[in-house]
Amino acid sequence: MAQKHPGEGGLCGAHHSGGASLRTLGPSVDPDILSFSGLRDSAGSAPNGTRCLTEHSSPKYTQPPNPAHWSDPSHGPPRGPGPPLAEEDPDQSEASSEESGVDQELSRENETGYQDDGNSSFLSIPSTCNCQGTPGIPEGPYSEGRDSSSSNFCHHCTSPALGEDEELEGEYDEEEPLKFPSDVSRVPSEKKPAPRRQRHRVPAKEDTREGGRRDPRSPGRHRLGRKRSQADKRRGLGLWGAEELCQLGQAGFWWLIELLVLVGEYVETCGHLIYACRQLKGSDLDLLRVWVGVWAGRLRGWAQVMFQFLSQGFCYGAGLFTRFLRLVGALLLLALALLLGCLQLGWRFLVGLSDRLGWRDKATWIFSWLASPTWQRCLILLRESRPWQQLVRIVQWGWLELPWVKQRTNRQANAPVAGGRYCQPEEEVARLLTMAGVPEDELNPFHVLGVEATASDVELKKAYRQLAVMVHPDKNHHPRAEEAFKVLRAAWDIVSNPERRKEYEMKRMAENELSRSVNEFLSKLQEAMNTMMCSRCQGKHRRFEMDREPKSARYCAECNRLHPAEEGDFWAESSMLGLKITYFALMDGKVYDITEWAGCQRVGISPDTHRVPYHISFGSRMPGTSGRQRATPDAPPADLQDFLSRIFQVPPGQMSNGNFFAAPQPGPGATAASKPNSTVPKGEAKPKRRKKVRRPFQR
């Protein structure tokens, strides 16, 4: 093993009596002189028979140099292998030069001593200094500029041609040194990456000292060291190969030592483990099994106790919660009963008091007067008045806050309001984009602005400004804010121009009037289509469409199924255990409930029969015809004729047979007259003949 020697700057081996040693001479590990000696280890046997490495009495290698000491100024200049040092501050150049002189003297003495002894075990590399005077003395790594690359050249080796390098900048790039995983493999002869070279400048007046000498802190000294390193790099290519070989060999040697130490530790650990396993007995396994069983039983017991504790806690908590809910329910029920009792008692007290004081008749008169049409008409006029609407707007805007009045909210989704708005700009943009596809002629500007149709110009202007601030593309960064602003601008153009606003109001009034007329016409038409004329009361009865198909329209109690029906079939069905009779008929391909018409006609039909008892004819009987008559397709329905006659004020007598269109054949206008003859059986006068005539076919 190797360790630092306290008296030398490099690495020294163990004691000369034994142990492996690696020694380098000089104040630092210099690539010029390297020495190796044999490796020798000793081993001994432990009391248990295991062979292991024994320690020597001489100092042993403990660890590679601590990198923390390289930056600690209290330990002096670092010696031995270490990382390449960064560029030193100019203020420390003088101290470095003094230390370099001492290191050079020690190096000369050591080299001279070993040359005198004639030791041939050292590998000597001749100096490349070409000076005639002083022989080449390798400089320490902490000399000028701490540049170890110039250790093989003296300061006399500076060629005049190096001055030309001052005008070049970045011509030759510095090569990075070999990097090894271990810090011990780094030697002072490594090339450190030099910073970017700068042009040489003439020293200023403040850079010189008294007597004309140059300030040693000036950066020119470091540039001189870099110039020498560049010259060494270009001239000593052969020497660099030897240095790299030495570095690689030293790094491999340290790697081998670390590998041997690691393998020895693992072998020793495995030996202890094997020895411990050999000492085990059969009883130890039994004890281990018993120990595992005991701990397994303990863990199982703890798990059971924990499970029981959790289950009991859960059950207890659930019971408490249910009891609490029952208690709350009982309290609420009690409070409700007390409230109802108090209300009933109070109402009885008020009624008795009013009876004694005679207020009951007055209260009845007041309530009847409030429910009168006159009071309702007065309330409607008050609500439609402009002062009342202004008061409502003031309350809704928040100018007059009342605790029982809610603040104004959006009428449609997120529609803006004239004041007190809490809508977000994104919501307003989304609302306006829903109306982007509406044409401008059909656009409702009041809905876009979020105001009433009766809003004043001031309200419209205020609403437009508020929306413009939220929707404008310069204020809102929504990708479709421009489209929303176009919709808002179109609405504002309509209401801001008096002529366009008047035109829009006239158009809206016409549309409202037209829609009202159309709605009335459709409602009357729907009513007419869902009514039947009655010849007995000369009125109309409603009919209701049923959700039944003609193929399964009639219910038969004998077959317990539904039978198909034909056009004009008239039958009855019972429900509610026979207490309710409902009459049905198939007209225009649909099943209708005509119970009102049948009740007015006083038709008596047995319900749930297998055969159709009666048939409704929609056309008058022609002479010489009998049986069922079908309505002619050219004649319009009787209900539509009556409806059109009422609209156009045409008296029924002017229509031929009640037909407004004067059809050549007897139209269905005679349905009302023929219905009693066709539906009401003549059993009252001639019951037998009527049955034979009306039931000629079997169902």
From Swiss-Prot:
GO terms for biological process: protein transport. It comes from the Eukaryota. Residues 219-228, 687-699 have a biased composition (Basic residues). The keyword Transmembrane helix applies. Residues 75-84 have a biased composition (Pro residues). Residues 117-133 have a biased composition (Polar residues). Residues 1-230, 655-699 are annotated as: Disordered. It is found in: Endoplasmic reticulum membrane. Residues 662-673 have a biased composition (Low complexity). Residues 86-102, 163-176 have a biased composition (Acidic residues). It is a multi-pass membrane protein. One of its GO terms (molecular function) is dopamine receptor binding. Residues 444-508 form the J domain. Residues 203-218 have a biased composition (Basic and acidic residues). GO terms for cellular component: endoplasmic reticulum membrane. Keywords: Chaperone, Endoplasmic reticulum, Host-virus interaction, Membrane, Protein transport, Transmembrane, Transmembrane helix, Transport. The chain crosses the membrane at residues 251-271, 301-321, 327-347. Regulates the export of target proteins, such as DRD1, from the endoplasmic reticulum to the cell surface. Promotes cleavage of pestivirus polyprotein. PANTHER family: DNAJ HOMOLOG SUBFAMILY C MEMBER 14. Interacts with the FxxxFxxxF motif of DRD1 via its C-terminal domain. Interacts with pestivirus nonstructural protein NS2. This is DnaJ homolog subfamily C member 14.
